Amino acid sequence: MSVPPKYRKIKDFAKFYYDKPMSVLTIFVGGNHEAMNYLQEQYYGGWVAQNIYFMGYSGVINVNGIRIAGVSGIHSKYDWKKGHFETYPFAGGQIKSAFHTREFEIMKLSLVKDPIDIFVSHDWPTIISNHSNVKILTRIKPHFDKDIRNN
């Protein structure tokens, strides 16, 4: 995982994977702090533990008549136009590029014909901060300030 060493510990997920199933259906997309070597095995999505479903790098699922679309990853202008070239064990910068969203994942979703009820992404939509208290947000998370200013 591409995180500081203090976060490289097995935490709650192992509990749900091995011992205690999640009590409700949990659907997620990948971001920049997931174990991408594990999620790569589920490129198209799939069950990662009992009652926990990974939506894949991009995809649409139907849950009780509700259509949910999602895209994993974070935006990187350097990898946006590339394909997925990373292989495990990750070498060099691959540990970071593995979780970058690719343009073709968005293009695949744009081909979906039927309406989508819910869209899930890891990255915030542009200008979402216009609908929040930016002062409080940047006081709690100062590193967001630059992202907000740059859209």
Placement of each model-derived feature along the sequence:
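Core catalytic region of metal-dependent phosphoesterases/phosphodiesterases
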Residues: 1-63
